Amino acid sequence: MELRFIEHKEAQDERGKYTRDEYRIGNYVVFRELSVYNTGSTFENFGIRANREVDFLPDIYYNYNLFDDDGRTREFKIQTTSYGSLYPNEIQQVIDGYKEAVEVVNVLTDKFLK
């Protein structure tokens, strides 16, 4: 699965510099936002949007936890849900959606978090 770069935007003010890069991967759009403050601190965030025209495609979230043991846990998580009773072809769509989400998370982790 290929992570394709789409667009780069940047802005600056008296507090620092801000960038936003847009990517596409599979049925997802990924926004990587980076803030570099004049104080020397940085903040990174990811927004990941699933294509809502694809049934059973789970949401992916970026988790940045300052309160874990190491103080800086960064990871992507996949939203799970229960759909109740489904037909076999719908179950296959759920499985395919989770497989795609896992693949996307692996690519994003390799590219941005390692």
Regions found by a protein language model. Give the residues of each.
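Positively charged, low-complexity terminal tracts
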Residues: 1-85, 93, 100-114
